[in-house]
Amino acid sequence: MENPLAAAVGSRRAPLSRSLMGLLAGLLCSTAYAGPFQVYGSEFAWVNNFNNSTINSSFSTNSVPGMTVWYNFASFSLYGYPAIVRGWHYGWNPANDTLFPKQLSATSSIPCTFSYSSGGSNMAGDFAYDMFLRWDNARSTPQLEVMVWAGNDSWPIGSQTGTNVLTTGGFTFDLWEGNNSAAGYYVYTFIPHGTAGQGNLPTGGGLNVDMKTFFNWLQAHRSNAGHYSNSMYLDVVEAGLEVTRGNGWAFVTANINAH
């Protein structure tokens, strides 16, 4: 059966909206895990391709988790999210690491490092951290998603509700938020100020941050909305590239911890 969302996205002439990407992700990710992976101790590199999209890969051979991916997608859609992962993605964790789930009220810091580079033509997407949370420690389907974007030329889900809300890691962030109805959870996205929908995917960069900074902000400014509380459990932290178009390559490497 033809995917009507994919058909609609394929006909677009502007960058794919995050709302459509969210719908696609909600329909496609669930419990089916496509794409190769490589375990690096407590973390793993995973070519999370959606709908069996062709994303080729080569994993780093040293002890630092990293990978290069290359692909050729002419039209806009959400083809995958190759990423470095620590924790339980929808209850799946081939590294069997036990750092997560971790209750945020009992967590003092979540130090993360993330570096990336890319090259090619018509490249589009977003280099981003992706985090899933639950109200319990069941290692199961997410009940909240929090994203922190770095270099991008895309659009977050929902609408912008905050400008210059915090500064860390060399960026000042805006906040976007909205409901991913297809996936069944709410999404908060912190994105570098003024970068939503910019014309070009950056060819290199990085984002080294303490993720607890973002959760502290949500506790102070969004806990009354009912979507987030520091009593929630963090299931997973991922750092990678949401691939939405291009003929080229990307490299990602990351290290994720929590105390």
Identify the residue ranges that each predicted region occupies:
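N-terminal secretory signal peptides that target proteins for export/translocation
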Residues: 1-15
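Bacterial N-terminal signal peptides
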Residues: 18-30
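N-terminal segment immediately downstream of the Sec signal-peptide cleavage site
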Residues: 34-82
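N-linked glycosylation sites
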Residues: 51-52, 56, 96, 152, ...
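Surface-exposed extracytoplasmic segments
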Residues: 55, 60-61, 65-76, 91, ...
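Extracellular-facing segments of soluble proteins and assemblies that are Gly/Ser/Thr-biased and enriched
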Residues: 86-167
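Short helix-loop boundary/capping segments
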Residues: 137-213
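Long, compositionally biased interface segments
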Residues: 197-259
